[in-house]
Design a protein with these regions (language model features):
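Amphipathic, positively biased hydrophobic alpha-helical segments used for protein targeting
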Residues: 22-26, 56, 128, 279
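N-terminal periplasmic/intermembrane-space "pro-region" immediately following the signal or transit peptide
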Residues: 3-48, 170-172, 375
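Outer-membrane beta-barrel pore domains
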Residues: 36, 58-62, 106-108, 216-375
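Intrinsic disorder/low-complexity signature
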Residues: 10, 69, 246-248
Length: 375
């Protein structure tokens, strides 16, 4: 790292910690208005901001770029109209516009739940995590998802459809199946639907709910395996050269609390995307994997009066493209990443600093400083 990069990163770190020092203690949930014993309205928010310095990425071609960004700003709302009926409506800032993220009615039918509307289709753990509930790492593994399962649908990986969710064996076995809009137009001239499914088994503690997190910060003993698959006839290609899309993934998470109170997490996933050997602008045929290890240090420290725990981590991503993607790239890419989090309040408040090197046609080094807060 040259002196210019060091100064910029150092100033960014100092600014963020000074900002944190002036924050009030954050609550673990948003505001909730109780109407009666079964009806309520709840609202919350989520923010993720970052500063990225990339070597040789300035217009000059020899200087480092300096890019601050608001990566996510979300407003969450949940309305319970009946003890068995909830409506979730979430929005996110997208550039200068506010987009609908989720707009879904959830019916608890006892044996299973029925969800209708715009939602996240059943998928791999990373997609279910979303950006706020990843373990340790700041962003999704580059290329690991070979483009998100849901990116042919609506904003943020969501899609319009209907899904059912259920569990058995005390919540250790969870399953989900959905039918979604999928690709509209283009190769899909017959308005085919996309079928999505996931099957999860927890060998140790059960994980609650459909949405997942990739760590429990030591609150659970986790050994969980998940399988997901998506399929759409004529889901890729062009109007004159269609192909069927099939994608599947297998992911695993292991979490253990050591005798000294430290928490170790090991996470990994494998993805395979098949586009019927057709070129597609949104989905790239190929396979990929990632492995991640993190170590949440025992005990809390204090920085500027804010108590938290340090969590160093490392991640490796391998990404092999069989077909050209939308930037005409093929072949193997690997990404090495190392960083540290300052975990203040679980997923609700943390600061991340990381280095990432992407080895594609050329090697690209990035330094990222990020912070996320939820209410």
């Amino acid at each position: 790292m040259n002196l210019s990069i060091f100064k910029r990163v150092f100033c960014g770190i100092a600014a963020i910690f000074l900002f944190i020092a002036g924050l009030p203690v954050l609550a673990a949930a948003g505001a909730k208005i109780k109407i009666d014993d079964t009806k309520f309205f709840q609202i919350g928010m989520g923010f993720r901001g970052s500063l990225t310095v990339e070597e040789d990425a300035a217009t000059s071609g020899t200087d480092s770029s300096f890019n601050p960004a608001t990566e996510n700003f979300r407003l969450y709302t949940v309305s319970q109209a009946h003890k068995n009926i909830q409506v979730e409506f979430n929005t996110e800032l997208n550039a200068n516009d506010v987009e609908v993220l989720d707009s879904v009615a959830k019916l608890d039918l006892g044996v299973f739940d029925l969800w209708i509307g715009r939602q996240l289709p059943p998928s791999d753990r990373l997609n279910m995590d979303g950006p706020f509930y990843l373990n340790a790492a700041w962003g999704y593994p580059a290329g690991a998802q070979l483009q998100s399962f849901g990116n042919q649908g609506q904003f943020g990986g969501r899609d319009d459809g209907i899904a059912i969710h259920g569990d058995a064996n005390g919540g250790k076995l969870e399953w989900a199946y959905g039918v979604f809009e999928g690709l509209e137009g283009g190769a899909d001239q017959e308005d085919n639907v996309r079928h999505t499914a996931s099957l999860t088994y927890a060998f140790d503690d059960a994980e609650p709910g459909f949405y997942a997190g990739s760590t429990y910060f030591g609150a659970k003993k986790i050994t969980t395996l998940n399988f997901a698959m998506h399929h759409e006839e004529d889901g890729v290609g062009t109007a004159t050269d269609q192909g069927d899309f099939t994608g599947y993934s297998v992911d695993a998470l292991i979490e253990r609390t050591l005798g000294n109170g430290a928490v170790v997490d090991l996470e990994g996933a494998y993805y395979d995307w098949d586009t019927d050997d057709k070129f597609d602008n949104t989905i790239t045929q190929g396979d990929s994997f990632f492995v991640l290890a993190s170590y949440l240090m025992p005990g809390k420290t204090s920085i500027a009066g804010i108590q938290g725990q340090f969590q160093p981590y490392t991640r490796y991503v391998g990404y092999n493209r069989d077909m050209k993607n939308d930037t005409a790239k093929t072949g193997y890419t690997d990404v090495v990443e190392a960083g540290v989090n300052y975990v203040i309040d679980g997923f609700n408040a943390k600061v991340t600093a990381l280095w990432q090197q992407t080895d594609d046609v050329t090697k690209i080094d990035q330094y990222v400083l990020g912070m996320q807060f939820q209410l």
